[in-house]
Amino acid sequence: MPMIHHHISDLRAALQPYRAAPRIALVPTMGNLHEGHLELVNIAKQHADIVVVSIFVNPTQFGVGEDFDSYPRTLDEDVAKLATVGADYVFAPSIDEMYPVLPPPTTILAGTITEQLCGKTRPTHFDGVGIVVSKLFNIVQPNVAVFGQKDYQQLAIIKQLVRDLSYSIEIIGAPIVRAADGLALSSRNQYLSESERQIAPILQQELQYLAKQITDKQQPLDVLLTAARERITSAGFIIDYLEIKTAELTAVDDDSVNEHQELVVLVAAGLGRARLLDNQLVTINKSL
């Protein structure tokens, strides 16, 4: 069973003996863990000797009217799940422990990368992600940290943060873990009704179809996107965004497609009470 710490000073003291030689991995989560989170721990164990999992529903990354109050808190169940995959420590701080003053006077702004995709409709979200991840990095001082690729934009922002703030931390992006029908695993999937859960896999199916169309290069990108948006909307989703970007999240058009080895199709869409995120990498065949 992993050791649980609720205070920064206690966790630091527990980790101090490991600073000299063993590698420490951090897996940041908001709890309500599923198989996708457990796979992050499995990956972390491949790269480190000690694995710390943080469980903290971070208020600074939620906007007005979002689901901060209703987000599931399931600490006991989470710790039991983490025991099955061999996590060593759980850090589950209170809000007061993480933020003596709320909102925190110090902020971390990641620049233009936050102004697109999720950042368009959640303008303060990545500011909150930046401050909490920076605090966790400072508290745990890991050698490696593991994040899921489902939150593709977040992963890109964290890589930028590590580079710009000179953290000596290896960031590992873990492949998306999916249900048998293709739906990307997410704690918010439990918001879906039974009928919505049957519809939800259509999102991934559309991403795969769109990726194939991009590689076939039979139609302009904007035509492909328009048709895909119409299909997704007709299935019952409310689209926040559906966009094609370079792997580095810069803009791409028909003239510049062949300049890149890889593109990514990203989507955020509402279905009932759930906001679903997914993405699909697209390898460009330059011979076509």
Curated annotation (Swiss-Prot):
Q: List the Gene Ontology MF annotations in alphabetical order.
A: ATP binding; pantoate-beta-alanine ligase activity
Annotated localization: Cytoplasm
Cite the active-site annotation. Answer: H37
Q: Keywords assigned by UniProt?
A: ATP-binding, Cytoplasm, Ligase, Nucleotide-binding, Pantothenate biosynthesis
UniProt record, GO biological process: pantothenate biosynthetic process
Pfam families on file:
Pantoate_ligase
Chain's role: Catalyzes the condensation of pantoate with beta-alanine in an ATP-dependent reaction via a pantoyl-adenylate intermediate.
Q: What is this protein called?
A: Pantothenate synthetase
Q: Which organism is it from?
A: Psychrobacter arcticus (strain DSM 17307 / VKM B-2377 / 273-4)
Name of the encoding gene: panC
